């Protein structure tokens, strides 16, 4: 492990991770502007060289392309990576307001697709990407437990900022992790969610630590984002944009 990176246990999972992880939403190439595959692979190599072991992706990032790139990067060195991915939004039925996985069998088949794209036989942390009380929550939970028993996932959790949903998801105390948006601009989880996670032994995975780039010191009121970057909405919707600008 890198001498300057720090590592810590991920809650009660028994998994040790680098304190800084690499999120791979942008690697999908369909939400943060155009990305080049070789650039993504070089970035992953750079992260590894600097002690990063934790990599987070999802089936919906680039419609699976982000997972495929991570799988390519892991070839021949799977043991260097702690892989977290997600399931739920891919093929989501907006009219019914539920995921495509209405049976445990369908859900397990969905995770098998994650495994195939990642080119691995196990996932370290498998997460529900659904962040509200989806009718199929119980399907996800049973599926996660079966997959864990089969050795195809080491731990499971949920990505949500909804405290009531988190408690429902963890009603049996078997959930391992929570992924949540948290930064110096968004500290609302300090009131209820983070104390709950500490009490329950949940590993907390922070997303949005630099607030989608706002805290990187690169943006001004005149910044405009390119085609394919969802942040274009910030200046297309002045009211939303002002919410961000006031915190710069």
Residues covered by each model-derived region:
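Short, acidic/polar
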Residues: 34-47, 102-118, 160-168
């Amino acid at each position: 492990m890198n001498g300057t990176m720090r590592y810590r246990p991920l809650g009660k999972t028994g998994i040790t991770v680098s304190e800084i992880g690499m999120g791979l939403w942008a690697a999908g190439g369909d939400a943060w502007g155009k990305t080049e595959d070789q650039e993504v692979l070089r970035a992953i190599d750079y992260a590894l060289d600097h002690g990063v072991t934790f990599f987070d992706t999802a089936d919906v990032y680039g419609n699976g392309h982000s997972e495929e790139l991570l799988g390519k990067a892991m070839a021949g060195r799977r043991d260097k990576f702690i892989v977290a991915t997600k399931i739920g939004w891919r093929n989501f039925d907006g009219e019914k307001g539920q995921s495509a996985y209405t049976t445990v069998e369908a859900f397990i088949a969905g995770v098998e697709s994650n495994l195939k794209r990642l080119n691995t036989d196990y996932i370290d942390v498998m997460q529900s990407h659904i962040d509200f009380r989806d009718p199929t929550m119980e399907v996800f939970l049973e599926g996660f437990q079966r997959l864990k028993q089969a050795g195809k996932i080491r731990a499971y959790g949920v990505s949500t900022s909804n405290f009531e949903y988190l408690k429902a998801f963890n009603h049996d105390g078997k959930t391992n992790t929570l992924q949540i948006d948290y930064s110096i601009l968004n500290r609302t989880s300090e009131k209820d969610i983070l104390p709950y996670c500490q009490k329950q032994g949940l590993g907390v995975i922070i997303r949005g630590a630099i607030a989608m780039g706002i805290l990187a010191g690169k943006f001004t009121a005149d910044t405009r984002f390119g085609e394919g970057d969802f942040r274009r909405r910030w200046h297309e919707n002045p009211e939303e944009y002002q919410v961000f600008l006031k915190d710069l």
